[in-house]
Amino acid sequence: MQFIDQARITVRGGRGGDGIAAFRREKYVPAGGPSGGDGGCGAPVVLEADSNLQTLLDFKYKRLFAADDGRRGGPNKCTGASGKDLVIKVPCGTEVRHLRTGILLGDLTAPGERLTVAFGGRGGLGNAHYLSNRNRAPEKFTEGREGEEWPLQLELKLLAEVGIIGLPNAGKSTLIAVLSAARPKIADYPFTTLVPNLGVVRRPSGDGTVFADIPGLIEGAAQGSGLGHDFLRHIERTRLLIHLVDAGSEDPVADLNVVQQELEAYGHGLVDRPRLLVINKQELVSEDDLPKLQQELKEASGRPVLCISAAMGTNLDQLLAETWVELGV
């Protein structure tokens, strides 16, 4: 399935139904008064968060969403039927903004959470409203009003508590596959992961914690280079980052600094997010050199450094233990 995390749509509330001019016509009331009913209200457009959706793909091919119009009024002061609400399902984690102003209208994070994004127009008034002492047989009625119409920007930010970050080929997909039931595409070349992958990792209590494998960052990602700019938004909601550094890299310290700089450039508080610094693929470094590398990264980052091998399953229990401590679970 194609992963789409941004979409532009237009929503339009239904038009209100027209009021009508009508008069009572009964056998023994030859000169009945006005009885024109009001028009029904136009339907609103409502967005609803749905936990079964993972992408905004549905909005790639359909951009205009128009709700039902209200019905016109009827005789005997009958009000026309209102339009049925147009409910549009979106993934949990969808932010909704006005396209032209950028104003945040809502952030749908909980399943079933709703946001009305366009109200329908009010129904028109029937001529029964215009009866007066001066005019006993008014012909006047009003038309229904147009519904609201707005251009919207939808932006999906995945709901994950833990984000796994690092340069391409650092082993992020392997780690999430080993820790969870996720089955991302894995290969030994950069940019194998082209979309974020989610996996659920069980806590000691048995509850699940969502981990996200974010496609590899490169230098300049925050300015749009590579894949990082498109997907950094998906770690904005995380509570913890696991930063993987490839032990087999030519310059692991430089790799560390690239990711650090990109987090700083992107902003949104990512650089201050709690983070575990982890050397992956420790089997690629000799037992004598591994402590040296660990010390170099510690001095460069000011953080403790864990050593693991996702592929070999080495020290993963220690990594998870540190993760649960950071999350307070």
From Swiss-Prot:
Gene Ontology cellular-component terms listed: cytoplasm
Single GO MF descriptor: ATP binding
Keywords from the named record: ATP-binding, Cytoplasm, GTP-binding, Hydrolase, Magnesium, Metal-binding, Nucleotide-binding
Listed cofactors: Mg(2+)
EC numbers on record: 3.6.5.-
UniProt KW Membrane keyword: no
GO process terms (BP): ribosome biogenesis
InterPro entries assigned to the protein according to its UniProt record, in alphabetical order: G_OBG, GTP-bd, GTP-bd_Obg/CgtA, GTP1-OBG_CS, GTP1_OBG_dom, GTP1_OBG_dom_sf, OBG_GTPase, P-loop_NTPase
Residue ranges of every copy of the Obg domain listed in the record: 1-159
Residues annotated as domain OBG-type G: 160-328
Residues annotated for ATP binding in this entry: 166-173, 191-195, 213-216, 280-283, 309-311
Location within or outside the cell: Cytoplasm
Residues holding Mg(2+): 173, 193
Major enzyme class: hydrolase
Family: Belongs to the TRAFAC class OBG-HflX-like GTPase superfamily. OBG GTPase family.
Function as written in the Swiss-Prot or TrEMBL entry: An essential GTPase which binds GTP, GDP and possibly (p)ppGpp with moderate affinity, with high nucleotide exchange rates and a fairly low GTP hydrolysis rate. Plays a role in control of the cell cycle, stress response, ribosome biogenesis and in those bacteria that undergo differentiation, in morphogenesis control.
Subunit structure: Monomer.
Protein name: GTPase Obg
Lineage: Bacteria, Bacillati, Cyanobacteriota, Cyanophyceae, Synechococcales
